[in-house]
């Protein structure tokens, strides 16, 4: 009888080309997603050495980081962005790669379009020159970010050199209370393990609460695995995953689908499989969460207060949290619900999908954005935007005073016109609250879409569980 293995072990073993004596491995890569920021040097490297893209049919390119989310018929104000966008278009054409430009309905954030096109599939290995590639693990794919030199290596060989990570299982038992979401689950996990707790691991998310999440919710959880320090995050595929992918443009069809299903149904950790570390959370005890500092581990319940760093024993950590408080312009002991906001951003590869927009629209309907807040909603892709408009969500947002934008990474990161001004405070559905992440000296609080929408209307954080 074979030894019980984890889901990660199974996918790894199925893609292992070679293992050296020192544990360095060569792994076959099934899918490669490419965007405009981390690819120019990689293509230049291919050109300089006379190489071709080894498997252009397994490569998909899209612009997302630098594109403006306003009217795209008007000139892009940033010369560097123009150059990177043009470079990707030229490289895709030269090397024979399918490419979605900023005017293509299929364009969007790379980690939104992969699943919605059926390019992301269970049991595959997926890489991209972007840290949030872990998103695709929601479908039972082994997916993680790579550096620019590795982008070149994968383009040239369809393989990647790496060492195997350890296994960690995070089991979330119980049922989530109303108003608590997948975003709150992953923020709670990061708050528990810290931003380095997952270092050297691939995380598998399991348990009743994870199974109850939609595919959008699972993508949110897997998306932020990297913020917990993990290499990747995984959820074993089930009927929800299959239903999501069925009939997608790039998903298998007919007999090929049936054959794929026979493989996919085996993609789960065996009973008795060894995990190097286990963590359990009770979903029923989770509140809506807000980050207060400059690290995703700086989490607190919306009903809580800004913590006092002086109560931290470790000196380095104490000084770090004091710095965070100063940067954020907050005082220990302040109620989270007393924190006033200047901006609200609903979107990103964490929370820019149709379910996220529906949740925000449900809160916003019939209400009005606070006069002190500038709020914007940025769909994760052209397909999401089209669906939202078909459901009338755009009208709900616009009537409530939100800006309704074109798809892209937008205010998740300060690489396009959507930026915070110095000391502006933003409730954001994105994944990182680092210093300067959304703009020079900008202050970011991470929340769920419903929490962000409620904060936009109230002008400060509110407990969405009590929203009327």
From Swiss-Prot:
<dbReference type="InterPro" id="IPR050067">
    <property type="entry name" value="IPM_dehydratase_rel_enz"/>
</dbReference>
<dbReference type="GO" id="GO:0003861">
    <property type="term" value="F:3-isopropylmalate dehydratase activity"/>
</dbReference>
<protein>
    <recommendedName>
        <fullName>3-isopropylmalate dehydratase large subunit 2</fullName>
        <ecNumber>4.2.1.33</ecNumber>
    </recommendedName>
</protein>
<keyword id="KW-0456">Lyase</keyword>
<dbReference type="InterPro" id="IPR015931">
    <property type="entry name" value="Acnase/IPM_dHydase_lsu_aba_1/3"/>
</dbReference>
<dbReference type="InterPro" id="IPR033941">
    <property type="entry name" value="IPMI_cat"/>
</dbReference>
<comment type="function">
    <text>Catalyzes the isomerization between 2-isopropylmalate and 3-isopropylmalate, via the formation of 2-isopropylmaleate.</text>
</comment>
<feature type="binding site">
    <location>
        <position position="412"/>
    </location>
    <ligand>
        <name>[4Fe-4S] cluster</name>
    </ligand>
</feature>
<keyword id="KW-0100">Branched-chain amino acid biosynthesis</keyword>
<keyword id="KW-0432">Leucine biosynthesis</keyword>
<keyword id="KW-0479">Metal-binding</keyword>
<dbReference type="GO" id="GO:0009098">
    <property type="term" value="P:L-leucine biosynthetic process"/>
</dbReference>
<dbReference type="GO" id="GO:0051539">
    <property type="term" value="F:4 iron, 4 sulfur cluster binding"/>
</dbReference>
<keyword id="KW-0411">Iron-sulfur</keyword>
<keyword id="KW-0004">4Fe-4S</keyword>
<dbReference type="Pfam" id="PF00330">
    <property type="entry name" value="Aconitase"/>
</dbReference>
<dbReference type="InterPro" id="IPR001030">
    <property type="entry name" value="Acoase/IPM_deHydtase_lsu_aba"/>
</dbReference>
<keyword id="KW-0028">Amino-acid biosynthesis</keyword>
<keyword id="KW-0408">Iron</keyword>
<dbReference type="GO" id="GO:0046872">
    <property type="term" value="F:metal ion binding"/>
</dbReference>
<comment type="subunit">
    <text>Heterodimer of LeuC and LeuD.</text>
</comment>
<comment type="pathway">
    <text>Amino-acid biosynthesis; L-leucine biosynthesis; L-leucine from 3-methyl-2-oxobutanoate: step 2/4.</text>
</comment>
<feature type="binding site">
    <location>
        <position position="409"/>
    </location>
    <ligand>
        <name>[4Fe-4S] cluster</name>
    </ligand>
</feature>
<dbReference type="InterPro" id="IPR004430">
    <property type="entry name" value="3-IsopropMal_deHydase_lsu"/>
</dbReference>
<feature type="binding site">
    <location>
        <position position="349"/>
    </location>
    <ligand>
        <name>[4Fe-4S] cluster</name>
    </ligand>
</feature>
<dbReference type="InterPro" id="IPR018136">
    <property type="entry name" value="Aconitase_4Fe-4S_BS"/>
</dbReference>
<comment type="similarity">
    <text>Belongs to the aconitase/IPM isomerase family. LeuC type 1 subfamily.</text>
</comment>
<dbReference type="InterPro" id="IPR036008">
    <property type="entry name" value="Aconitase_4Fe-4S_dom"/>
</dbReference>
């Amino acid at each position: 009888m074979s030894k019980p293995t984890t889901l990660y072990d199974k996918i790894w073993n199925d893609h292992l080309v070679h293992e050296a004596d020192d544990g360095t491995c060569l792994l076959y890569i099934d899918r490669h997603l490419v965007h405009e920021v981390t690819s120019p040097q990689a293509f230049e490297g291919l050109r300089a050495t006379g190489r071709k893209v080894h498997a252009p049919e397994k490569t998909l390119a899209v612009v997302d980081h630098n594109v403006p989310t306003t009217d795209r018929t008007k000139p892009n104000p940033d010369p560097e962005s123009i150059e990177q966008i043009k470079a990707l278009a030229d490289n895709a054409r030269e090397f024979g790669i399918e490419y979605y430009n900023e005017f293509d309905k299929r364009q969007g954030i790379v980690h939104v379009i992969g699943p919605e096109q059926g390019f992301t599939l269970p049991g595959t290995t997926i890489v991209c020159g972007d840290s949030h590639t872990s998103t695709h693990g929601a479908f039972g794919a082994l997916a993680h970010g790579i550096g620019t030199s590795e982008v070149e290596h994968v383009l040239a060989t369809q393989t990647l050199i790496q060492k195997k990570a350890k296994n960690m299982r995070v089991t979330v038992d119980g049922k989530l209370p109303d108003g608590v979401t997948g975003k709150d689950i992953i923020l709670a996990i990061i708050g528990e393990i810290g931003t380095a707790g997952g270092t050297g691991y691939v995380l598998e998310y399991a348990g009743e609460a994870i199974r109850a999440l939609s595919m959008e919710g699972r993508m949110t959880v897997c998306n932020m695995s990297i913020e917990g320090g993990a290499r990747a995050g995984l959820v074993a595929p089930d009927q929800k995953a299959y239903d999501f992918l069925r009939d997608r443009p790039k998903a298998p069809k007919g007999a090929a689908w049936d054959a794929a299903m026979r493989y996919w149904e085996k993609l789960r950790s065996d009973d008795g499989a060894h995990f190097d570390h286990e963590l359990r959370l009770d979903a029923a005890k989770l509140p809506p969460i807000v980050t207060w500092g400059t690290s995703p581990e700086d989490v607190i319940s919306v009903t809580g207060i800004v913590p006092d760093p002086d109560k931290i024993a470790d000196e380095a950590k104490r000084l770090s949290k004091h710095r965070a408080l100063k940067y954020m312009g907050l005082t220990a002991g302040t109620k989270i619900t007393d924190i006033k906001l200047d901006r609200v951003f609903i979107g990103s590869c964490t929370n820019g999908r149709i379910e996220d927009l529906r949740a925000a629209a449900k809160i916003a309907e019939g209400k009005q954005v606070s006069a002190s807040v500038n709020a914007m909603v940025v769909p994760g892709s052209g397909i999401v935007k089209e669906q939202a408009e078909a459901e009338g969500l755009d009208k709900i947002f616009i009537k409530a005073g939100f800006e309704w934008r074109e798809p892209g990474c937008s205010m998740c990161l300060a690489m396009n016109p959507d930026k915070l001004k110095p000391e502006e405070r933003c409730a954001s559905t994105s994944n990182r609250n680092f210093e300067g992440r959304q703009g020079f000296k900008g202050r970011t609080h991470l929340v769920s879409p419903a929490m962000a929408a409620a904060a936009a209307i109230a002008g400060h954080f509110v407990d969405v569980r009590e929203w009327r």
